[in-house]
Protein backbone atom coordinates (compact mmCIF):
# COMPACT_ATOMS: atom_id res chain seq x y z
CA UNK A 1 0.00 0.00 0.00
CA UNK A 2 2.79 2.36 0.94
CA UNK A 3 4.69 1.48 -2.24
CA UNK A 4 1.64 2.27 -4.39
CA UNK A 5 1.12 5.63 -2.66
CA UNK A 6 4.81 6.45 -3.10
CA UNK A 7 4.64 5.62 -6.81
CA UNK A 8 1.54 7.77 -7.26
CA UNK A 9 3.23 10.64 -5.41
CA UNK A 10 6.32 10.40 -7.63
CA UNK A 11 4.17 10.28 -10.74
CA UNK A 12 2.25 13.37 -9.59
CA UNK A 13 5.49 15.26 -8.93
CA UNK A 14 6.79 14.23 -12.35
CA UNK A 15 3.64 15.53 -14.04
CA UNK A 16 3.97 18.84 -12.20
CA UNK A 17 7.60 19.17 -13.26
CA UNK A 18 6.85 18.40 -16.90
CA UNK A 19 3.77 20.60 -17.16
CA UNK A 20 3.75 23.35 -19.77
CA UNK A 21 1.25 26.17 -19.56
CA UNK A 22 -0.75 26.66 -22.75
CA UNK A 23 -3.57 29.13 -23.26
CA UNK A 24 -2.97 31.11 -20.07
CA UNK A 25 -2.50 34.81 -20.66
CA UNK A 26 -1.28 37.80 -18.69
CA UNK A 27 -3.15 41.03 -19.43
CA UNK A 28 -2.55 44.71 -18.84
CA UNK A 29 -5.63 46.75 -18.05
CA UNK A 30 -5.44 49.97 -20.10
CA UNK A 31 -8.59 52.04 -19.79
CA UNK A 32 -11.48 49.76 -20.53
CA UNK A 33 -9.38 47.33 -22.56
CA UNK A 34 -7.38 44.24 -21.71
CA UNK A 35 -4.07 44.16 -23.57
CA UNK A 36 -2.29 40.86 -24.11
CA UNK A 37 0.97 41.66 -22.32
CA UNK A 38 2.92 38.49 -23.15
CA UNK A 39 2.78 39.03 -26.89
CA UNK A 40 3.64 42.73 -26.59
CA UNK A 41 6.64 42.10 -24.33
CA UNK A 42 8.18 39.39 -26.50
CA UNK A 43 7.36 41.26 -29.73
CA UNK A 44 9.09 44.39 -28.43
CA UNK A 45 12.14 42.31 -27.53
CA UNK A 46 12.24 40.78 -31.02
CA UNK A 47 11.83 44.22 -32.63
CA UNK A 48 14.62 45.59 -30.41
CA UNK A 49 16.89 42.72 -31.50
CA UNK A 50 16.16 43.41 -35.17
CA UNK A 51 16.71 47.16 -34.79
CA UNK A 52 19.95 46.59 -32.89
CA UNK A 53 21.25 44.20 -35.54
CA UNK A 54 20.21 46.61 -38.31
CA UNK A 55 22.06 49.51 -36.65
CA UNK A 56 25.18 47.41 -36.16
CA UNK A 57 25.01 46.07 -39.72
CA UNK A 58 24.76 49.52 -41.32
CA UNK A 59 27.64 51.11 -39.43
CA UNK A 60 30.98 51.54 -41.18
CA UNK A 61 29.82 50.25 -44.56
CA UNK A 62 32.76 49.73 -46.89
CA UNK A 63 33.24 49.36 -50.63
CA UNK A 64 35.08 46.11 -49.99
CA UNK A 65 32.69 44.45 -47.51
CA UNK A 66 33.84 42.78 -44.33
CA UNK A 67 32.61 39.34 -43.28
CA UNK A 68 29.74 40.86 -41.29
CA UNK A 69 28.70 43.11 -44.16
CA UNK A 70 28.91 40.15 -46.53
CA UNK A 71 26.53 38.21 -44.30
CA UNK A 72 23.99 41.06 -44.23
CA UNK A 73 24.23 41.50 -47.99
CA UNK A 74 23.67 37.77 -48.44
CA UNK A 75 20.45 37.97 -46.38
CA UNK A 76 19.24 40.96 -48.39
CA UNK A 77 20.04 39.21 -51.67
CA UNK A 78 18.19 36.12 -50.48
CA UNK A 79 15.07 38.15 -49.65
CA UNK A 80 15.34 40.05 -52.94
CA UNK A 81 15.65 36.85 -54.97
CA UNK A 82 12.75 35.24 -53.13
CA UNK A 83 10.53 38.27 -53.83
CA UNK A 84 11.61 38.49 -57.47
CA UNK A 85 10.95 34.80 -58.05
CA UNK A 86 7.41 34.97 -56.71
CA UNK A 87 6.31 38.41 -57.94
CA UNK A 88 8.26 38.85 -61.15
CA UNK A 89 11.12 40.94 -62.47
CA UNK A 90 9.07 44.04 -63.29
CA UNK A 91 7.01 44.39 -60.11
CA UNK A 92 9.06 42.95 -57.26
CA UNK A 93 11.16 45.93 -56.10
CA UNK A 94 8.48 47.87 -54.11
CA UNK A 95 7.60 44.67 -52.23
CA UNK A 96 11.09 43.69 -51.05
CA UNK A 97 10.84 45.72 -47.78
CA UNK A 98 7.43 44.23 -46.95
CA UNK A 99 8.43 40.61 -47.61
CA UNK A 100 11.79 41.17 -45.90
CA UNK A 101 10.16 42.61 -42.79
CA UNK A 102 7.75 39.69 -42.58
CA UNK A 103 10.51 37.12 -43.06
CA UNK A 104 12.95 38.63 -40.57
CA UNK A 105 10.35 39.24 -37.85
CA UNK A 106 8.98 35.70 -38.13
CA UNK A 107 12.46 34.17 -38.35
CA UNK A 108 13.78 35.96 -35.25
CA UNK A 109 10.50 35.37 -33.38
CA UNK A 110 10.59 31.65 -34.14
CA UNK A 111 14.23 31.28 -33.18
CA UNK A 112 13.71 33.27 -29.99
CA UNK A 113 11.33 30.55 -28.82
CA UNK A 114 14.10 27.97 -29.13
CA UNK A 115 17.12 30.02 -28.04
CA UNK A 116 15.89 32.53 -25.44
CA UNK A 117 14.97 31.27 -21.94
CA UNK A 118 11.57 32.99 -21.87
CA UNK A 119 10.25 30.81 -19.06
CA UNK A 120 12.73 32.02 -16.45
CA UNK A 121 10.79 35.29 -16.33
CA UNK A 122 7.86 34.76 -13.99
CA UNK A 123 4.49 36.33 -14.68
CA UNK A 124 1.35 36.41 -12.52
CA UNK A 125 -0.37 34.27 -15.17
CA UNK A 126 1.00 32.26 -18.07
CA UNK A 127 4.52 32.23 -19.47
CA UNK A 128 6.53 34.22 -21.95
CA UNK A 129 7.08 32.51 -25.28
CA UNK A 130 7.89 33.31 -28.89
CA UNK A 131 5.50 35.93 -30.33
CA UNK A 132 4.55 33.54 -33.12
CA UNK A 133 3.49 31.02 -30.46
CA UNK A 134 0.30 33.07 -30.10
CA UNK A 135 -2.53 33.11 -32.63
CA UNK A 136 -2.95 36.88 -32.16
CA UNK A 137 0.51 37.48 -33.64
CA UNK A 138 0.12 35.14 -36.59
CA UNK A 139 -3.27 36.63 -37.48
CA UNK A 140 -1.77 40.13 -37.18
CA UNK A 141 0.91 39.06 -39.67
CA UNK A 142 -1.52 37.41 -42.07
CA UNK A 143 -3.98 40.31 -42.26
CA UNK A 144 -1.48 42.85 -43.72
CA UNK A 145 -0.53 40.18 -46.24
CA UNK A 146 -4.16 39.92 -47.29
CA UNK A 147 -4.45 43.72 -47.51
CA UNK A 148 -1.26 43.83 -49.61
CA UNK A 149 -2.75 41.17 -51.89
CA UNK A 150 -5.83 43.27 -52.67
CA UNK A 151 -3.84 46.52 -52.83
CA UNK A 152 -1.38 45.10 -55.34
CA UNK A 153 -4.15 43.83 -57.61
CA UNK A 154 -6.19 47.05 -57.47
CA UNK A 155 -3.09 49.21 -57.98
CA UNK A 156 -2.05 47.23 -61.04
CA UNK A 157 -5.42 46.62 -62.68
CA UNK A 158 -7.80 49.17 -61.18
CA UNK A 159 -11.47 48.25 -60.98
CA UNK A 160 -10.98 45.66 -63.70
CA UNK A 161 -9.27 43.58 -60.98
CA UNK A 162 -12.71 42.49 -59.75
CA UNK A 163 -13.32 40.80 -63.10
CA UNK A 164 -11.18 37.86 -62.04
CA UNK A 165 -13.90 36.74 -59.65
CA UNK A 166 -16.13 35.69 -62.55
CA UNK A 167 -13.37 33.76 -64.32
CA UNK A 168 -13.62 31.26 -65.90
CA UNK A 169 -17.39 31.37 -65.30
CA UNK A 170 -19.67 33.63 -63.20
CA UNK A 171 -20.94 30.54 -61.36
CA UNK A 172 -17.63 30.48 -59.47
CA UNK A 173 -18.09 34.02 -58.10
CA UNK A 174 -18.85 32.95 -54.47
CA UNK A 175 -16.02 30.41 -54.45
CA UNK A 176 -13.48 32.86 -55.88
CA UNK A 177 -14.45 35.54 -53.34
CA UNK A 178 -14.29 33.02 -50.49
CA UNK A 179 -10.88 31.83 -51.66
CA UNK A 180 -9.42 35.33 -51.60
CA UNK A 181 -10.87 36.37 -48.26
CA UNK A 182 -9.78 33.17 -46.51
CA UNK A 183 -6.13 33.42 -47.56
CA UNK A 184 -5.08 34.75 -44.11
CA UNK A 185 -6.46 31.64 -42.37
CA UNK A 186 -3.95 29.04 -43.63
CA UNK A 187 -1.09 31.52 -43.24
CA UNK A 188 -1.90 32.29 -39.61
CA UNK A 189 -2.93 28.81 -38.43
CA UNK A 190 -0.02 27.03 -40.14
CA UNK A 191 2.54 29.30 -38.50
CA UNK A 192 0.82 29.25 -35.10
CA UNK A 193 0.33 25.48 -35.03
CA UNK A 194 3.85 24.61 -36.09
CA UNK A 195 5.57 26.98 -33.65
CA UNK A 196 3.34 25.98 -30.73
CA UNK A 197 3.92 22.29 -31.44
CA UNK A 198 7.65 22.85 -31.81
CA UNK A 199 7.91 24.62 -28.44
CA UNK A 200 5.87 21.91 -26.69
CA UNK A 201 7.93 19.11 -28.23
CA UNK A 202 11.13 20.73 -26.93
CA UNK A 203 9.80 22.04 -23.58
CA UNK A 204 8.49 18.75 -22.19
CA UNK A 205 11.69 16.66 -22.69
CA UNK A 206 13.83 19.50 -21.32
CA UNK A 207 11.77 19.51 -18.13
CA UNK A 208 12.05 15.72 -17.76
CA UNK A 209 15.64 14.88 -18.68
CA UNK A 210 19.05 16.58 -18.59
CA UNK A 211 19.80 19.30 -21.12
CA UNK A 212 22.01 17.15 -23.35
CA UNK A 213 19.23 14.75 -24.38
CA UNK A 214 16.83 17.30 -25.98
CA UNK A 215 19.59 19.08 -27.95
CA UNK A 216 18.79 17.20 -31.23
CA UNK A 217 15.15 18.27 -30.83
CA UNK A 218 16.28 21.86 -30.33
CA UNK A 219 18.26 21.78 -33.58
CA UNK A 220 15.26 20.26 -35.33
CA UNK A 221 13.15 23.06 -33.86
CA UNK A 222 15.54 25.70 -35.22
CA UNK A 223 15.37 24.13 -38.66
CA UNK A 224 11.56 23.94 -38.55
CA UNK A 225 11.33 27.54 -37.36
CA UNK A 226 13.46 28.76 -40.26
CA UNK A 227 11.38 26.76 -42.74
CA UNK A 228 8.14 28.25 -41.37
CA UNK A 229 9.47 31.79 -41.82
CA UNK A 230 10.49 30.92 -45.38
CA UNK A 231 7.08 29.38 -46.15
CA UNK A 232 5.20 32.41 -44.82
CA UNK A 233 7.33 34.88 -46.79
CA UNK A 234 7.16 32.77 -49.95
CA UNK A 235 3.38 32.44 -49.79
CA UNK A 236 2.94 36.15 -49.04
CA UNK A 237 5.04 37.05 -52.09
CA UNK A 238 3.24 34.44 -54.21
CA UNK A 239 -0.17 35.86 -53.25
CA UNK A 240 0.94 39.38 -54.18
CA UNK A 241 2.35 38.16 -57.49
CA UNK A 242 -0.85 36.22 -58.19
CA UNK A 243 -3.02 39.30 -57.62
CA UNK A 244 -1.01 41.31 -60.14
CA UNK A 245 -0.99 38.55 -62.73
CA UNK A 246 -4.75 38.13 -62.37
CA UNK A 247 -4.92 34.36 -62.57
CA UNK A 248 -5.23 31.43 -60.16
Swiss-Prot record:
UniProt keywords, alphabetically: ATP synthesis, CF(0), Chloroplast, Hydrogen ion transport, Ion transport, Membrane, Plastid, Thylakoid, Transmembrane, Transmembrane helix, Transport
Chain segments annotated as transmembrane: 37-57, 96-116, 134-154, 200-220, 221-241
Membrane topology, record value: Multi-pass membrane protein
One Gene Ontology MF term: proton-transporting ATP synthase activity, rotational mechanism
SUPFAM superfamilies (alphabetical): F1F0 ATP synthase subunit A
GO cellular component: chloroplast thylakoid membrane; plasma membrane; proton-transporting ATP synthase complex
Subcellular location per the Swiss-Prot or TrEMBL entry: Plastid, Chloroplast thylakoid membrane
Gene3D superfamilies assigned: ATP synthase, F0 complex, subunit A
Subunit: F-type ATPases have 2 components, CF(1) - the catalytic core - and CF(0) - the membrane proton channel. CF(1) has five subunits: alpha(3), beta(3), gamma(1), delta(1), epsilon(1). CF(0) has four main subunits: a, b, b' and c.
Family stated for the protein in its record: Belongs to the ATPase A chain family.
HAMAP family from the UniProt entry: ATP_synth_a_bact
Record's function text: Key component of the proton channel; it plays a direct role in the translocation of protons across the membrane.
NCBIfam families: ATP_synt_6_or_A (TIGR01131)
Protein name as it appears in the record: ATP synthase subunit a, chloroplastic
Organism (species): Anthoceros angustus (Hornwort)
Name of the gene this protein is made from: atpI
